[in-house]
Amino acid sequence: MQLNSTEISELIKQRIAQFNVVSEAHNEGTIVSVSDGVIRIHGLADCMQGEMISLPGNRYAIALNLERDSVGAVVMGPYADLAEGMKVKCTGRILEVPVGRGLLGRVVNTLGAPIDGKGPVDNDGFSAVEAIAPGVIDRQSVDQPVQTGYKAVDSMIPIGRGQRELIIGDRQTGKTALAIDAIINQRDSGIKCIYVAIGQKASTISNVVRKLEEHGALANTIVVVATASESAALQYLAPYAGCAMGEYFRDRGEDALIIYDDLSKQAVAYRQISLLLRRPPGREAFPGDVFYLHSRLLERAARVNADYVEAFTKGEVKGRTGSLTALPIIETQAGDVSAFVPTNVISITDGQIFLESNLFNAGIRPAVNPGISVSRVGGAAQTKIMKKLSGGIRTALAQYRELAAFSQFASDLDDATRKQLDHGQKVTELLKQKQYAPMSVAQQSLVLFAAERGYLADVELAKIGSFEAALLAYVDRDHAPLMQEINQSGGYNDEIEGKLKGILDSFKATQSW
């Protein structure tokens, strides 16, 4: 059989038309060492900092060290079966987590995968865990309050929307309790909450989730979990993942509150990763960039202006500002606030709530030390009534603490000093509050009004608690409209002052406690 040149060219054309080739450029490398969740890879020439590297078994690692002839990466997840010689690939993507309203009411891990047994998460898309914080021009000053429901905090150390307020103290001083109560108090405020648990026991987190559910706050909250048994990489990344979920609400003109519990454990996880990557250690064996670790996270908590929100949503949301308020928690050792990580975070944040173990052990809970606790920007966000009534409280407590120290050495005290000591003791007693019992602005205002106007003068110290409980029950029963008005407006004028005075006069005349 003889083919002529025309037939041959036709056959070749047909074969060329049928030929289908899909070329994929894979940047592939080989694992050369595996140690404690850190792998060293040879051959990834075009790898980026922070890039996800695909490992065998549908797992990923993140590239953190880019060296001349190798890449150091941390494995996200189990690593026991990884071995030298295994092939890995670059993905060309950085780590992203699911974001959106579908995450509210769910418990997820660092990567956004559900761990609460309630099925898949309904998300609105993905966001990169690392993001640049809004610039100065995109921000707006803090002038709206976040009510924690604690008299001691809302009166003396007020927190505003978009603020970063550090909660610092030794272990077992009520840091998590304060943060959880702040979340519970946002049930009806419209503020979405994110609770990031880093390096805690799974049983502790389970209790927190159960309490949030009991008090009707879980539906408004995303819980991000990296337990103590998980890899250091997941503990290090958990706060950034939670922050990305919070930014979803901030950038769409809504308000969000995020709790990092706690950043001390994140710093320890990062130290572990850095030492395994053979980065040079510095003070307390932390790497040189441990300040940047926290500053780039906490700077993302901000109040953004309406122009930023409008530009981000492409005009869908107009005239609304957004905010992400951060309450990072730091655990100190024996009250040492001058250690490396505590001083770093104190310098980054807009104030701190210092909880003292000796106050906690003395039964003063929340164990807030008003002397060294401060809110640098929250004063502008305080409601008018709280600002008016709380000024005298801080002064009374400061004078009381000074006189209490002095009175230990003086046997005979004049009447004025005795009155100040008595008033200070009663204010201290009044600021005590049970856990899971946050108070509204109106309730706090009434109690502070009673303290400031001398209505506690003839009340025995032991009966302050029952006096407060009876007073709140009385106003809820007989003066609910006024309480509602104060909660809605937060205003203070002669009329409201007169009504509060009338309530306290009639209560003391007709009620018992």
Swiss-Prot record:
Pfam family, one: ATP-synt_ab_N
EC number: 7.1.2.2
Sites annotated Required for activity: 373
Keywords, in A-Z order: ATP synthesis, ATP-binding, Cell inner membrane, Cell membrane, CF(1), Hydrogen ion transport, Ion transport, Membrane, Nucleotide-binding, Translocase, Transport
Bilayer topology: Peripheral membrane protein
Location (main, coarse): membrane
Binding site for ATP: 169-176
Catalytic activity: ATP + H2O + 4 H(+)(in) = ADP + phosphate + 5 H(+)(out)
One Gene Ontology molecular-function label: proton-transporting ATP synthase activity, rotational mechanism
First-tier enzyme category under EC: translocase
One cellular component (GO) term of this entry: plasma membrane
Cellular location(s): Cell inner membrane
HAMAP family recorded: ATP_synth_alpha_bact
Complexes and interactors: F-type ATPases have 2 components, CF(1) - the catalytic core - and CF(0) - the membrane proton channel. CF(1) has five subunits: alpha(3), beta(3), gamma(1), delta(1), epsilon(1). CF(0) has three main subunits: a(1), b(2) and c(9-12). The alpha and beta chains form an alternating ring which encloses part of the gamma chain. CF(1) is attached to CF(0) by a central stalk formed by the gamma and epsilon chains, while a peripheral stalk is formed by the delta and b chains.
Role this protein plays: Produces ATP from ADP in the presence of a proton gradient across the membrane. The alpha chain is a regulatory subunit.
Family: Belongs to the ATPase alpha/beta chains family.
Name assigned to this protein: ATP synthase subunit alpha
Organism for this UniProt entry: Salmonella paratyphi C (strain RKS4594)
Organism classification: Bacteria, Pseudomonadati, Pseudomonadota, Gammaproteobacteria, Enterobacterales
GN (gene name): atpA
